[in-house]
Amino acid sequence: MAKASITRNYRFPTLNDLYFLPGGNPALNNESGFTYETGLSFSVDKDKVYTLSGSASWFDQHINDWIIWLPTSKGFYSPVNLKKVHAYGVEVQADYAVAIDKAWKLGLNGTFAWTPSIHEGEPTSKADQSVGKQLPYIPEYSATLSGRLTYRSWGLLYKWCYYSERYTMTSNAVSYTGHLPPYLMSNVTLEKGFSLRWADLSLKGTVNNLFDEEYLSVLSRPMPGINFEFFIGITPKWGKKKK
């Protein structure tokens, strides 16, 4: 199946953008622009044994007054408008699900994105080297792989993520503080579902950053190493008729 779309974009600054202390900028302009997108998708299946689906799309986005938070000489970040930004790229996704038998099921998912986001406005000064460069903190490449194995009401999920290097400066200077190196991330989750008379109960335990990867999302702010989450979800069956 083929698809195509043209979208008119318009975004107001958030309250944080305008009034966060310190760093909010009440003088921000609204973002506006157009997004052009086209793509292909497919889906095939065999009875109830397996399903295979995938999609690939190309997008081309032209935004005026793009809002971005950048570091200041005062030691904190503040949002500014970039007059013209050209963001474009390719996004690919594939899904595969198979019933191994009546109780066991396996699902696989993969994504890949190539997303350059280029500043195409005018330089604000003679020292401004940001024009024609990738926007700070936006990776050009990213990918994910995940697998889910279920047995009746049990589920085991593994997710792997990759993010390419990100620049921290608008000039894209490659220095010790000018870029953040690429990193890999692995998370694993074990879950169990229960169906009670009055509610559906879900228990999940997750190990984030399974291999204790050292990485940064923002310069000088290390992210947690291996860490653990526990989740309990309760969905009441109020109003449902008993079978």
Tell where the protein language model's regions lie, with residue ranges.
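Outer-membrane beta-barrel translocator domains and adjoining extracellular loop/strand segments
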Residues: T14-L21, D65-K74, H119-D128, K159-W160, ...
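Hydrophobic, well-ordered secondary-structure elements that form the walls
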Residues: A4, T38, A56, V92, ...
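Gram-negative outer-membrane beta-barrel transporters
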Residues: Y50-H62, N81-T168, D200, F211, ...
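Outer-membrane beta-barrel signature, preferentially recognizing the C-terminal barrel domain
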Residues: M1, T7-I63, L70-I100, L135-Y141
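C-terminal beta-signal and adjacent terminal beta-strands/loops
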Residues: N64, Y162-S171, H179-P181, N187-K243
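Hydrophobic alpha-helical packing residues
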Residues: A4, L15, G147, K240-K243
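Hydrophobic alpha-helix-in-membranes signature
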Residues: F12, T115, L135-I138, L180-P181, ...
